[in-house]
Amino acid sequence: MGKPALILASQSPRRRDILSLTLIPFETMAIETRETLDPTSSIEENVTKIALEKAECAAALLPKQNGKTIILTADTVVAKGNRIYGKPAGFDEAFEMLKSLQNRSHRVYTGFVLLCCDKIHTECVTTTVELEPMSDNEIKRYILSEKPYDKAGSYGIQDPLMACYIRRIEGCYHNVVGLPLSRVCKALKTFL
């Protein structure tokens, strides 16, 4: 019996790029789910629940594989205090998010799920990031240049312009990009 196939059920090019660093062959799969946060649950519970919903959606779309397919999904949000920052709806929301995140620390939460038949691994990884102050013009330039509308918190830590404003990071860099690679690899070993 060969090794199971790995499917990254995500439309994120950043997650695809991160997972490719492992040199493990995988396929990607686009799925559509509602990413609804439950205000009565913790941030960790929310991102893990959304990642699980994505995995279950992907599993429902795949033919039965007799335990030969591992599905990987993830969900990322940014939070400062009790405020959660998802993906911005447009320029104004992106501007407001970056304005409020600058010059103070915030946390990036990524929940990920590995699913294969009846075996499920769920985990949430948290990284603290602190941004330098940014002028209104610097924020505008960043948004117009990088168009961060598909990124939680309105920024990509990997974006060249953002490198100028990262004061401190505590935890996993790849988590901030969208997939905590070291934790995913550790969990993946139990499936292979």
Swiss-Prot record:
Enzyme nomenclature, EC number: 3.6.1.9
Cofactor section: a divalent metal cation
Main location: cytoplasm
Catalyzed reaction equations: dTTP + H2O = dTMP + diphosphate + H(+); UTP + H2O = UMP + diphosphate + H(+)
This protein's UniProt keywords: Cytoplasm, Hydrolase, Nucleotide metabolism
Gene Ontology molecular function terms on file: dTTP diphosphatase activity; UTP diphosphatase activity
GO biological process per UniProt: nucleotide metabolic process
Entry annotation: catalytic residues: 75 (proton acceptor)
One GO term describing the cellular component: cytoplasm
Any one Pfam family match given in the protein's UniProt record, by short name: Maf
Localization per record: Cytoplasm
Family classification: Belongs to the Maf family. YhdE subfamily.
Its biological purpose: Nucleoside triphosphate pyrophosphatase that hydrolyzes dTTP and UTP. May have a dual role in cell division arrest and in preventing the incorporation of modified nucleotides into cellular nucleic acids.
Protein name: dTTP/UTP pyrophosphatase
